[in-house]
Design a protein with these regions (language model features):
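Short amphipathic alpha-helical segments, especially helix-boundary/capping motifs
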Residues: 6, 21-25, 52-58, 77-80, ...
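Short secondary-structure boundary micro-motifs
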Residues: 6-7, 15, 101, 151-153, ...
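Serine-dependent carboxylesterase/thioesterase catalytic core
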Residues: 29-35, 40-42, 46, 50-65, ...
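Helical cap/lid subdomain of alpha/beta-hydrolase-fold lipid enzymes
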Residues: 108-109, 114-247
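Flexible, membrane-associating and regulatory peripheral segments of lipid-active enzymes
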Residues: 1-31, 40, 44, 49, ...
């Protein structure tokens, strides 16, 4: 399924100028965008550019390639969040794949700072990296990962409900992670939005971008679940809810 990523990228680049005029505009609140495993800021540059055009104060993470939770990456994210908080008081965080797991944990540690979390193909219901197609590569870098996190085993508390509003954007045709590992439990401030596409193309998937722009346009304290406009409702097939396995 991931072979379709080139088509998603081409569609995004072709439609981006027109999309700017159709998407909801922001309020200037800082938005931090975290890349997926083995990716860096270059992978999120198209999305960040579009969001900047919508009036958001968008930031990449500036920590190079995401090779997993090293001490440098953990400390760098803490410093970046503190820096953004000092400027404005609250931020939105978008995390792609592994970046979404980071985003959720930042929100757990500092819920007073994070306005909301939006994840793209992030398998936060998994129990370990071996349940994805990049598990071998992740485990090969284990010696560089920090002792401050429980890797490769992901603790059960990491899969618990979030203290801030959260939107999980996922695809049933994801070729890297299992889609049901990307689902929030049913809560008033948690939602799951399915789009049609690939894992590696999610940040440039037009339907996903529409969801992101809609979520970021909400004012602080006024979070509501996503409701697609009637004209594009066909882009959003399902809205699944995570069901914990029986004991």
């Amino acid at each position: 399924m991931e072979v379709r990523v080139a088509a998603e990228v081409a569609s995004f680049l072709a439609s981006a100028p027109a999309m700017i005029g159709l998407l909801k505009r922001g309020h200037g609140r800082p938005v931090l965008v975290l890349p997926g495993f083995l990716a860096g800021d270059g992978s999120t540059a198209p999305l960040r550019g579009l969001l900047r055009g919508l009036g958001h104060d968008v930031h990449g993470w500036g920590l190079g390639r995401n090779i997993g939770p090293t001490d440098e990456i953990l400390d760098g994210m803490i410093h970046l969040v503190d820096e953004l908080r000092a400027r404005t008081g609250s931020i939105d965080i978008i995390g792609w794949s592994l970046g979404g797991l980071y985003a959720r944990e930042v929100a757990r540690l500092a819920p007073e700072v994070v306005h909301q979390v939006i994840t793209l193909g992030s398998p936060f219901q998994t129990t370990g990296p071996e349940q994805s197609r990049v598990g071998l590569a992740f485990n090969a870098l284990h010696d560089r990962h920090s002792d401050r996190v429980m890797i490769p085993r992901i603790p059960s508390w990491a899969r618990e409900p979030m203290p801030v509003p959260t939107t999980s954007i996922y695809s049933r045709t994801d070729g890297i992670v299992r889609w049901h590992h990307c689902l929030n439990r049913h809560l008033p401030t948690a939602e799951n939005v399915e789009v049609r596409g690939t894992h590696c193309g999610l940040a440039m998937n037009p339907a996903a971008v529409l969801v992101i722009a809609d979520r970021l346009a909400q004012k602080a304290g006024r979070w509501r679940p996503f409701r697609p406009p009637l004209a594009v409702r066909g882009l959003f097939p399902h809205s699944d809810v995570y069901e914990p396995p029986a004991a």
